[in-house]
Amino acid sequence: MTTYVAHVQVLQALHGDEDLLSRLDELGLVERRAEGYLPEEVERALVSYTLVRELGINWEGVEVILRLREELLATHRQVARLLGLLTELGPASPGDSGHPR
């Protein structure tokens, strides 16, 4: 089941910054639905708030930072998955270089 965060809750977290939320929607970074926002959209909105309102970064910079952030998070998940697989395989045999012959 998908969890949503109500519009009013997101606005509270953004200190009532409706303009910022509207801009994020225009840019396709969040989508306003009747049910509310997805948790990852709320996180994106909070990061955007910090970047724009507190650090003065322009919207083009925000888009780049958010894209790079999401790529970094995806890479982190992939590395964690690979580490899990390696752990399942167990330690390599002595003398095994780990390379196929």
Language-model features, listed with the residues they occupy:
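The alpha-helix within a helix-turn-helix
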Residues: 11
